[in-house]
Amino acid sequence: MAAQRYILVVAHTGRRDSLAAGVSVCRQLLAAGVVPVLSEGERRDLLAAEPELATVVALGAEVPPAELELVIVLGGDGTILRAAELVRGCPAPLLGVNLGHVGFLAESERDDLETAVARGLAKDYEVEERMTLSARVKVGEEVVYESWALNEATVEKANRERVLEVVIEADGRPMSSFGCDGVVMSTPTGSTAYSFSAGGPVVWPGVAALLLVPLSAHALFSRPLVVDADSSLAVELLEGAGGEGVLWCDGRRAFDLPRGARVVVRRSPIPVRLARLHPGPFTDRLVRKFTLPVTGWRGPDGRD
């Protein structure tokens, strides 16, 4: 007898379009003999809308994350980041169907939902691993907080009226100090997110690197930096100067930073796994997602 298959469905069930998509996906999974799994809250929302889907089970209470085969994510990049948090450290890849705006991490659009689910059921996808960050906060010699991020760990000022006074470091060595609104430390995946909005470079996801991008720095040397993926980056809030800060990991997990706190970011050994239906050059994804103008391109001339 074949083992029971479990697929997690992550949807923003507070939105009508996302809830409807979640209902559609659950029906398609059940028709294929696969058990849909949802978080407790999203399962309640789903059953309130469609009581006949009572065979849908709850994540954790009935099915542990380690038993999941796949995660189907219905929404934009924020929903994908939430899904990555739910299954952190588990082998199940994330298959994103964009219901948001840019949806840079998503693999398909709403019109292709049924086809995307069918390919997920058939295991007709490739798995791409994306690097993540580990973030550690130290006050003196004490580690007071630890977290992780797929996109970025950002140190921001806690008070709009006070700038942050920081020292930035690479590989345990001081590089510069300045006043700023914050500092973004990013993965290549995050280079098209907050880092990009702050003026950082786009880094191809296959590049092993970390990025550091100052936010509105009052300094002559405040350029974005790209360092080796095995380097460490750190931001230290100067004692007795500037305001207090907040560490945000992927814009989801926050920790208040007192003056003197030091945030150290390194490459995490735990990647996020993405299910890819359309493998191809990252350039094509960049052009498609950002609707970049390429009119007039005549193709390689044979001399490349």
Curated annotation (Swiss-Prot):
Gene Ontology terms describing biological process: NAD metabolic process; NADP biosynthetic process
EC numbers on record: 2.7.1.23
Origin species: Leifsonia xyli subsp. xyli (strain CTCB07)
Residues reported in the UniProt entry to bind NAD(+): 77-78, 82, 151-152, 162, 181, 192-197
A Gene Ontology cellular-component term: cytoplasm
Residue ranges the record marks as coiled coil: none
Gene that this polypeptide is encoded by: nadK
GO MF annotation list: ATP binding; metal ion binding; NAD binding; NAD+ kinase activity
Catalytic reaction equation(s): NAD(+) + ATP = ADP + NADP(+) + H(+)
Stored SUPFAM superfamilies: NAD kinase/diacylglycerol kinase-like
UniProt xrefs under PANTHER family: NAD KINASE
InterPro entries: ATP-NAD_kinase_N, ATP-NAD_kinase_PpnK-typ_C, NAD/diacylglycerol_kinase_sf, NADK
Cofactor(s) annotated in UniProt: a divalent metal cation
Function of the molecule: Involved in the regulation of the intracellular balance of NAD and NADP, and is a key enzyme in the biosynthesis of NADP. Catalyzes specifically the phosphorylation on 2'-hydroxyl of the adenosine moiety of NAD to yield NADP.
Keyword Transmembrane attributed: no
Catalytic residues in the record: 77
Domain of life from the UniProt record: Bacteria
Name of one Pfam family that matches: NAD_kinase_C
Protein name: NAD kinase
UniProt record similarity statement: Belongs to the NAD kinase family.
Keywords: ATP-binding, Cytoplasm, Kinase, NAD, NADP, Nucleotide-binding, Transferase
Subcellular location: Cytoplasm
NCBIfam families per UniProt: PRK03372.1
